[in-house]
Amino acid sequence: MRQPVLRFSRIGTQQQPLMVVDDFIPQPEQLLQYALQQGEVKQAGGLYPGLRSAAPAAFGTFLLQQLAQAVQDCFGLAPTQLQQIESYFSLVSTPAAALSPMQSIPHFDRPCPDELAAIYYLCDERHGGTSFYRHRSTGYEAITPECQVHYQRALQADFQMHGVPKGYICGNTPLFEVIATVPARFNRLVLYRCSSLHSGDIKPDYSYDLNPFSGRFTIASFLSAASA
């Protein structure tokens, strides 16, 4: 059994923290089997362009337990600050032509630098990894409450100047530039701040395969403080 391999880096001019863990789970195939038994699969709300269903609570518990010290070292967040986790099986299914403008640009999950997001790959490098971006006109690489309104206004100005974006972003554009890319790899976890601008690398020839064993199948997790 392979031991997990953890790498930490800081990306972009704002030096946002990024963690990558390879061989994260001892038996990842069990998650695929679990997913196939789930009956409630729905079109995702929000900006995710595909299908989602609940991942087992044990996945989130394992993540919090295994990475508690690493999260404190890399993100400066104590275990007491991250006691709640939501995890969802995720499968890209929305054709490029059906995307909204906000799905065609990098997004941030929440404007909260003290909350984290993770993507865990149950697919290989053929399905595209995750890229992190800088917004060219503002220089923002992460969106916080202090800059959110300014960022949204700048986006509207960009749309007027360059046109409304269409399709999946997968590399540099007039509005955004790539500051880091993490390729997909089976059993790889990527952990970053919820405020970081990012997007999956969905290429124009993506087949929208709805089979968890052969499509772009991942688990998305969101870590935050316990609810009051």
Q: Can you name each region flagged by the protein language model?
A:
Residues 1-228:
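Fe(II)/2-oxoglutarate oxygenase catalytic core
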